[in-house]
Structure formats: C-alpha cells, structure tokens
Amino acid sequence: MKKLYSGFDLCAPTTSVSMTINGPAPMILAFFMNTAIDQQVEKHLRATGEWESAKRRVDKYFEGRERPCYEGELPPGNDGLGLGLLGVSGDKVVDAETYERIKTETLASVRGTVQADILKEDQAQNTCIFSTEFAMKMMGDVQQYFIDNNVRNYYSVSISGYHIAEAGANPISQLAFTLANGFTIVEYYLARGMDIDSFAPNLSFFFSNGMDPEYTVIGRVARRIWARAMRERYGAGSRSQMLKYHVQTSGRSLHAQEISFNDIRTTLQALYALFDNCNSLHTNAFDEAITTPTEQSVRRAVAIQMIISRELGLNFCENPWQGSFVIDE
C-alpha cells in the first residue's frame, strides 16, 4: 500500500481515494489508514530534523532481516513520500504521544470512499465473497471506527446504483433500489446503536447516467427523497440530509461497433450529470466496450470533462436546465 500511494500526500485536500473493493474492505482500509498516518509521521520527522536518527532506528530494526524496497525509478514528480518507512510502522520511530497526535490529525483529514456496498452485490453483480449478514457487520464495524475516531471526510460506503443499472435496470428502478439500499443501511446502523447524525454524513451514493430522459433529474429526485426521509422519518440534522453522489457515464450504452462515436454518447451523459449537479463525475473511455482503455482513449475521456468545465458557457451557470437565471433571461 505504501508503494502504491508513494508520492501522493493522502492528507492533502486535493487527494481523494476511491477504494473500489467489495471483499475484505476493513483489511484494505486498515492498510490505507496506516499508510496515510505513516506518511505524516515521515513528514513530521523531516520537518523537525529527526529523519536521520529515525533512519538509523529503522536500519537497526531490519538488522539481519530482508528489508522491503521500491524497485525501479520513481516517476517524474514523485518525491517518494511514504517509502521511507517501508516495512515498519510510524509508532516504531516516534514516541507514543507524537504518534497518537499525528494519527488523530490524519484520520480527521484523510479523504476518500470505501465502495463496499454488499446489497448491490447481491442484487446486480453476484460476486459476493462473504454472506450478506457478515458483510453488513463489516460495513458497520468500519462506520463505528469512523465515529469513534472522528473520520469525517471519508465515506464509509458508496451506495451504488451504477451496477444495478449495468445489470439492466432503467433509471427509475436504479434509483428505487439504490435508495432502498441506503435506507436499509441506515436502519441497520441505527439498530447497532449509532446516532443518525454520527454516520449519515459518511454515506455517499453512486449512479449511472445513460441516455434516458429521466437521467436529467435522477440526482435532484434522489436528494429530495433522501432529505425529506432524513428530516421527517429520522429527525436528522441538515448535514445528514445532504445526499452526495458520484456519476459514471453508462458503460452499458457504449457500442462495440464504430467505437469512436462513443465519445458523443459519453459527452451527452456527462452533460446530464453536470447539469443535475452531481458531486463528482467519471467519463468512460470510448473503447471500454471492447478492451481496457488506452492512453489515447483515457485522454479523450478526461478532455470531455475539461472542455465542458472550462469552455461550455452554459456550465458556468449552476442548475441551467431547471429554472436558472440564465434560461429565464
């Protein structure tokens, strides 16, 4: 994990990691959090001038044992952050009080998402590693850890409708199943004794956007239903009423013939998502219908978002299709 994220400051506000894992999520999350904490330990040691003495302690720790190392050259712009403590935890090189302080600060600032929604696995993917009951328990354990350690900027689960849509659901069915799964998770966490306002802000959603007209409003409809249910059914506060969602353009809609035209489909779906005020967006590469994306197709997929964001004038006005100032004028 330290090699994987080396050079990326996991506590920087511009770094957000999506952990799209549907099996041993708590184990992988533990590796990730340890990596983030040890990065900050390394930064602390360098900033305080203690790095050389820490290196000597690490050398002594590995005396007579094989030491892990990064193979090959670092990519351009990669400063190797995180590689200094390969094979050793930060609590071995700083005192307990300093480590606990760094750990607390790290957990409060680290950003990302665990996409460990077992319910859509049952409904759409049929790739379950564990039983539904056990997987729900692990999801609850992750959320309880987030509550106990004030992990507020990391989503404990991405409640996913995308895979349901890819399995054949229309937009209305996708939304219905996804919200139902969300409320199921809410009820389960409440049954475990968690407070609604302690965990609801850690929930996020994930929708597909295809070509159907209902996709123009799927986000706002979801937000309206979620906000009213949170307020009126569960008595939740304003932050818990906010539904945050990611959109991925529809992989199912991509054609295997004339694949270059898929960029047109993806652009239209991206407009649906952005004009419906999604929080984040993934645009598919045009060749995903037949192969793993190439560098060229990935650049084109990114360019779709950049051109809409920086050059399309209508996108500069929030909510352009639904009673906005620019349309009224």
What are these regions (language model features)?
Residues 193-200, 227-240, 307, 318-329:
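Catalytic or ion-coupling anion/metal-binding cores of large enzyme and transporter domains
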Residues 268, 279-329:
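Active-site or pore-adjacent capping/gating segments
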Residues 1-209, 214-215, 233, 240-246, ...:
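Catalytic alpha/beta active-site cores
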